[in-house]
């Protein structure tokens, strides 16, 4: 199973990162004689522009040229952000629109991340694992191969305090919708976590757990294969 950054490494990364407040500015007006800073990305026509820049760079620019603008609309979706979203260019996985995957997360081959899922810094999505809609993998949460994390499920993150152990989900585990796996819990290979379960302690390999807090109710071998099947076709990419 892939392991990634330690809590201390993540804390150092966040501390050292240049904090960013990117904005997108839509402008109508007279742009004659305007000089744009090198840090600006500018698109548009003679009468209209779209500018991508940092909020701190926009302020002096506006003070210098604001009288020439007729209409202004500014979009800002973060403030002093330390962690950008992950560049997915070389990710060999299926990532659906609306998934939030932060830099320094690992997405292994053949994984699937569905709409609205959140993968935080230091988290690992194992080979062939599916993270369903609106599920959350907190910082350093780690899944093995061929895991299914159900819609709305939460694998708690541990960056603070740094001494805490991360959630570890071993291979071939099924986690039902809206289940919560608390910090430091390890779920053994082939286990099944029922929908809505609150998992506060380690789960043995091959066990089925349910309840709040959860307890072992039977063995996974007693569950019909059709109810725990991992479908390879859903992980297939273009040939």
Curated annotation (Swiss-Prot):
One of its GO terms (biological process) is lysine biosynthetic process via diaminopimelate. Keywords: Acyltransferase, Amino-acid biosynthesis, Diaminopimelate biosynthesis, Lysine biosynthesis, Repeat, Transferase. It catalyses: (S)-2,3,4,5-tetrahydrodipicolinate + acetyl-CoA + H2O = L-2-acetamido-6-oxoheptanedioate + CoA. Pathway: Amino-acid biosynthesis; L-lysine biosynthesis via DAP pathway; LL-2,6-diaminopimelate from (S)-tetrahydrodipicolinate (acetylase route): step 1/3. SUPFAM superfamilies: Trimeric LpxA-like enzymes. GO terms for molecular function: tetrahydrodipicolinate N-acetyltransferase activity. The keyword Acyltransferase applies. Its EC number is 2.3.1.89. InterPro entries: DapH, DapH_N, Hexapep, Hexapep_transf_CS, Trans_hexapeptide_repeat, Trimer_LpxA-like_sf. Catalyzes the transfer of an acetyl group from acetyl-CoA to tetrahydrodipicolinate. Belongs to the transferase hexapeptide repeat family. DapH subfamily. This is 2,3,4,5-tetrahydropyridine-2,6-dicarboxylate N-acetyltransferase. It comes from Staphylococcus aureus (strain Newman).
């Amino acid at each position: 199973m892939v392991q990634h950054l330690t809590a201390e490494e993540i804390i150092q990364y966040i501390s050292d990162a240049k904090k960013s407040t990117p904005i997108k500015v839509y402008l109508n007006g007279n742009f004659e004689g305007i000089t744009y800073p090198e840090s600006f990305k500018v698109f548009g026509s003679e009468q209209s522009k779209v500018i991508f820049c940092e909020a701190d760079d926009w302020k002096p620019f506006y003070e210098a040229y604001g009288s020439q603008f007729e209409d202004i609309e500014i979009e800002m979706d973060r403030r002093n952000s330390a962690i950008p979203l992950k560049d997915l260019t070389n990710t060999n996985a299926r990532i659906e629109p609306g998934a939030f995957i932060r830099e320094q997360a690992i997405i292994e081959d053949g994984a699937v991340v569905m709409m609205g899922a959140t993968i935080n810094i230091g988290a690992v999505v194992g080979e062939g694992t599916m993270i369903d809609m609106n599920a959350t993998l907190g910082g350093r949460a780690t899944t093995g191969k061929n895991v299914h994390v159900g819609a709305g499920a939460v694998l708690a993150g541990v960056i603070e305090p740094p001494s805490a152990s991360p959630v570890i989900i071993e291979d071939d585990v099924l986690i039902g919708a809206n289940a919560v796996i608390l910090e430091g819990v390890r779920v053994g290979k082939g286990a099944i976590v029922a929908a809505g379960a609150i998992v506060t302690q380690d789960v043995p390999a091959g066990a089925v757990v349910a309840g709040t807090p959860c307890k072992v109710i039977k063995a996974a071998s007693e569950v019909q294969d059709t109810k725990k099947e991992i479908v390879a076709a859903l992980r297939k990419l273009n040939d």
